[in-house]
Amino acid sequence: MLSMPSFERKQNIFANKDALGESYQPNKIEERDDEIEKYMDALQPVIDGWEPNNIFVYGNTGVGKTAVTDHLLDQLQTDVEAYDDVTLSVIYLNCKTLSSSYQVAVELVNKLRRPGAEISSTGYPQQSVFKKLYQELEALGGTILIVLDEVDAIGDRDDLLYELPRARSQGNLEDAKVGIIGISNDYKFQEQLDPRVQDTLCERELQFPPYDALELANILDSRTDIAIADDSLAEGVTQHCAALAARDSGSARQALDLLRLAGELAENQDADAISTDHVEAARSELERERVEEGMRELTTHGRLTLLAVVSKAAKADTPSRTRAIYDEYASLCKSAANTDDPLKQRSVHNHLSDLHMLGILSKYENRSGSRGNYYSYELDVPFESAVDAMADVLMLDAEIEKMEGLASRNGVL
């Protein structure tokens, strides 16, 4: 009978792996001096005792929006303690799973109420929920900053974003001074807002651009001093992680995830140090995970649509127009077992758009004058990652094998 394996600590690569994690808050935010200065200027009315600005912060995922917000609000809450005439409360709400002003208002009410006194998520008129929210805010009093992270999730159902900043002027609040900080990954969200909401919510706008490779390398260097053990990092590793992340999204989170996973791979192999080979292996694994995560959301026809783009890529024929991808898709439908007739081209176009939103495809708009505009698509993940993620899902082994052979001959692999 085999004995049960035991757990043993591995500490040859990492000194403090948590320093590479998403929840880690560094003492100093790197490479965001200009944004911090503008943000502090927008928050200055709080320390001065005036009504707070409403602030709209936007930029891609992983560019420091939430980290800078958390850092500055923590500092602000500490600094206001030096003044007797200012009290500050910060309410943080992630709106990712909320799709309307009503749902946001309910969540805010329940955050402000004591346990056991929460209200139901359904069954109230919207204005009734807003009234309850005003009552809770007024009871709290002082200056209140409401941080709505991923605020774009509520879409165009944005009544609260109009009502709340105006609550004091409309007589719904007397003692409480409320400011909203909206954080969004969607640059176009502001354009979708009601013009009245734009006027109130976007008093101060702060844009966080993607990091470049040098900035990402500096961020990684500051973390590796804490996270990685001495002599456990080969030369050029942080620069390689930074270059890959800068080329893709400019995301510090992506660069940190690459380094963390590369370290885990090195540790599992009992390597003395993290190498660029470990980084490349980590990149491939993260890409595969991204595709697989997106794949879980796809129907069979969504997967066949993706495989059609893979087929075009194998022929070195991408970016490809929707029509050409549709023809490839229809051919694959005939080969696939237990598959209904091909969908209409419009439905395949919708699947292509979904794949673009999931980060699996790149989408290009082509303007061709009198012939009208059209879209073309290509893979936004490595060919191997897309194939590997589908190999065990679609029963098209022979077709996939042909694609891999063709890709190899065309230099795609």
UniProtKB/Swiss-Prot annotation:
InterPro entries in the cross-refs: AAA+_ATPase, AAA_22, Cdc6_C, Cdc6_lid, ORC1/CDC6, Orc1/Cdc6_arc, P-loop_NTPase, WH-like_DNA-bd_sf
Family in the record: Belongs to the CDC6/cdc18 family.
GO biological process assignments: DNA replication
Protein name in UniProt: ORC1-type DNA replication protein 10
Any GO MF annotation of the entry: ATP binding
Lineage: Archaea, Methanobacteriati, Methanobacteriota, Stenosarchaea group, Halobacteria
Pfam families given in the database record: AAA_22, Cdc6_C, Cdc6_lid
Cited function: Involved in regulation of DNA replication.
Gene: orc10
Statement: the UniProt record of this protein carries the keyword Nucleotide-binding: yes
